[in-house]
């Protein structure tokens, strides 16, 4: 099964393949820009498409306005457990976003490890909807971690054009 969909940007196809078996279920880290105005059903549809029918143990997001709000609503609509991990801007200033992104990824990996068994791998799927510097930080961090992750780690960048392509006519 391929982890690539029409929504995946061309750069994602160049990512190294995971050294782990195909995951049977997932922990999802999802994020995107504060200005993303896609309706929740489009977000939900893309999350379901990227999960490829695998059960979702948990969906983690940054709790910001825009994409994160739509992601949280989509998880609720889909019946997926979800948790927000907001950035601590007061404590960390401009570094809060990258720190939060690292925490999201590490929490997802820990959760996947705790649910994995020798016969059933739980993977982490990072789904990045269109966004700015914060989303780019999440993508960069995730891509750097693919080969060193103790669990399967898959990274998908959703193309900005998907929003208009999926919109109802």
Please report, for each region that a protein language model flagged, where it lies by residue:
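Acidic/glycine-enriched connector segments
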Residues: 3-29, 34-168
